[in-house]
Swiss-Prot record:
Highly expressed in the adult heart and expressed at lower levels in the intestine and gall bladder. Keywords: Developmental protein, DNA-binding, Nucleus, Transcription, Transcription regulation. One of its GO terms (molecular function) is DNA-binding transcription factor activity, RNA polymerase II-specific. One of its GO terms (cellular component) is nucleolus. Residues 80-132 form the bHLH domain. The keyword DNA-binding applies. InterPro entries: bHLH_dom, E-box_TF_Regulators, HLH_DNA-bd_sf. This is Heart- and neural crest derivatives-expressed protein 1.
Amino acid sequence: MNLIGSYQHHHHHMMPDPFIFSPGSRCHQERPYFQGWVLNPGEVSPEFPAQPPYSPEYGAVVGPSQTSGRIENLGGKLGRRKGAPPKKERRRTESINSAFAELRECIPNVPADTKLSKIKTLRLATSYIGYLMDVLAKDSEPGGTEAFKAEIKKVDGKRRREPQPTEGYWGAAPAGEKKLKGRTGWPQQVWALELNP
């Protein structure tokens, strides 16, 4: 909002305003003194047009008690937050966030100070489910299984955007890795990218 706008200084020791010395400038000016000082007409909505502080019908100056209603109405319009979500949307967001917090607690071996995004939480949960499926599949085999590891490493943005070779997803297992029984592909690949050091 332009507070300086068309505010005119009437100090004689400063630069003179040509309007002060014009022949038609007696008691009343053509424009109200404070018009544009508080509100610029271009910044006010059409619901609240800028009106002069005097009533041309009666020739009387309008007092503050008569204009305060207009200012309060304008303040109410400008004071309201734009885009404030409704209660239903806030409750939905809180519900989703609490569900993600509960899901994060279910993933083992994640340090307490680690912040996980929603997508990382979903990927880790998917990988953990895959791990549990492998444990169930290997349960009948002698020898036991490894414990679940949730060591999180940071992956730089460039590596994340690079397309992954399809050979690692569906084809032969990379050298040094054994091919897992049952569910293979995406969850194990995500687990390898997100967690393994």
